[in-house]
Amino acid sequence: MQCYLCQSTDFSIRKGSVQDNDQLQILECQNCGLVQLSSQAHLQQGHYENSGMHGADPEPIEVWERNTAEDDNRRFEMLKTLLPNQRVLDFGCGNGGFLKKAQELASGVTGIEPERRVREHLSEQIQIFSELGALRGGSSFDLITAFHVVEHLSDPRSILCEFKKYLAPDGRIVIEVPSSSDALLTLYESEPFQHFTYWSQHLYLFNAKTLETLVQQSGLKVISIQQYQRYPLSNHLYWLSKGKPGGHKFWSFLDSPLLQQAYADTLSRIGQCDTLIAHLELCD
């Protein structure tokens, strides 16, 4: 097996396990640092179209919408200065939570989502297609987003290359991915977390360096790659104390805006936040 980014065959095996598939290993390239699964054979054709990402018993879309509402609002607030009177495409739009907020300001919103039941649910609320190739010829967008999608793609480079076809000359691409340098993995080395966080749907995990490499290989220009911490200190303390998720709910009394900002700023400074947010544009 070769590294997706640099074609090296020199891998180390990361500690931990893939939570839903014990046949897979987590490989880290010793040349460039990309983290990838040892195989992609478990993802069959039609996997995402048939709600395979959600397991054998997908939760109702209404429950899914409630669970993503906080992130949908965060992303809207993060990008709202870019939205007024702009044409927006959200690739892998999921339940459409971000787009439904974005259409308050944008001149038009479009979603790309392979999951059939979601398209049926959203078809009367927003314009939605199953793939980029289904867009009308000549379609152009001022903002293209992909939130926690790139890590699911077997060939993310080709998708980023496709984005270029639909991006307006002065447009922007914003992608958000989980970070392979998450402090729970690389600083605290939480063993329970190492057996919890890796997932068979996440084919790749990027750090700031490997994400920049992917962007450059796709012929795009990096405006910025930002460290962002989604989970607060209470979550991390709970993992370290109890070895379980949910600390941001059970121990929320520990959190305050000042404490969380100070903790997030510290993790950002050392490059070990749990999330990366990249702003991209076309090359000159």
Language model features by range: what are they?
Residues 86, 170-171:
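Surface-exposed loop/turn positions
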Residues 118, 181-183, 229-232:
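Feature marks short, surface-exposed loop/turn motifs that line or immediately flank catalytic pockets
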Residues 4-12, 208-227:
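A SAM-dependent methyltransferase catalytic signature shared across enzymes that methylate proteins
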Residues 152-155, 207:
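Acidic/polar helix N-cap motif
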